[in-house]
């Protein structure tokens, strides 16, 4: 039996948690008197760190900025964290797991948190579209191979 067959891929979610939350409405209450046709910008960033053998923390930072003209109506940021057991893979497969698969698991939790914060700020409902973290990760890898990538920041306009 080969050594590769003895090493099985292991994946387990140990914990999903909110690491940091921020909501700002710098122009409230004046912003509520304006017609609501905002420009919404969505910024995503992922970071991962190894906590122990085969145990990793992945943090997905989601920042939503809604602007009316030149003024910021609200700024909402959530850092959604997760602790994952990931074993039996390494290299690009491990990077994909930590940079795409785990953020894909964390995103619905961050999206729900942002939706709740925006609602509590009494702004109209905000529905964030699903994010293709696999495509973002592939773009990141392509930038790295071309030497253009600076950091792991990933951005998308909503």
UniProtKB/Swiss-Prot annotation:
Main location: cytoplasm
GO terms, biological process: protein folding; protein tetramerization; protein transport
UniProtKB keywords: Chaperone, Cytoplasm, Protein transport, Translocation, Transport
InterPro entries (UniProt xref): SecB, SecB-like_sf
One function term, GO molecular function aspect: unfolded protein binding
Record keyword Nucleotide-binding present: no
GO cellular component terms, semicolon-separated: cytoplasm
Coiled coil ranges: none
SUPFAM superfamilies given in the database record: SecB-like (SSF54611)
Pfam families in alphabetical order: SecB
Location relative to the cell: Cytoplasm
Domain of life: Bacteria
Quaternary assembly: Homotetramer, a dimer of dimers. One homotetramer interacts with 1 SecA dimer.
Protein role: One of the proteins required for the normal export of preproteins out of the cell cytoplasm. It is a molecular chaperone that binds to a subset of precursor proteins, maintaining them in a translocation-competent state. It also specifically binds to its receptor SecA.
Family: Belongs to the SecB family.
Name listed for the protein in its UniProt record: Protein-export protein SecB
Originating organism: Pectobacterium atrosepticum (strain SCRI 1043 / ATCC BAA-672)
């Amino acid at each position: 039996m080969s050594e590769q067959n003895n090493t099985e891929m292991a994946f387990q979610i140990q914990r999903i948690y909110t690491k940091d939350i921020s909501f700002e409405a710098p122009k409230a209450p004046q912003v509520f008197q304006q017609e609501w046709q905002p420009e919404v910008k969505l910024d995503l960033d992922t970071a991962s760190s190894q906590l122990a053998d085969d145990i990793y923390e992945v943090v997905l930072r989601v920042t939503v900025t809604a602007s009316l003209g030149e003024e910021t109506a609200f700024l909402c940021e959530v850092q959604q964290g997760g602790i994952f057991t990931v074993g039996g893979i390494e290299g690009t497969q491990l990077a994909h797991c930590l940079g795409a698969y785990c953020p894909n698991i964390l995103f619905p939790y961050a999206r729900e948190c942002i939706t709740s914060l925006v609602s509590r700020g009494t702004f109209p409902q905000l529905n964030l579209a699903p994010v293709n973290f696999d495509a973002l990760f592939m773009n990141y890898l392509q930038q790295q191979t071309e030497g253009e990538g600076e950091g792991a920041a990933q951005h998308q306009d909503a």
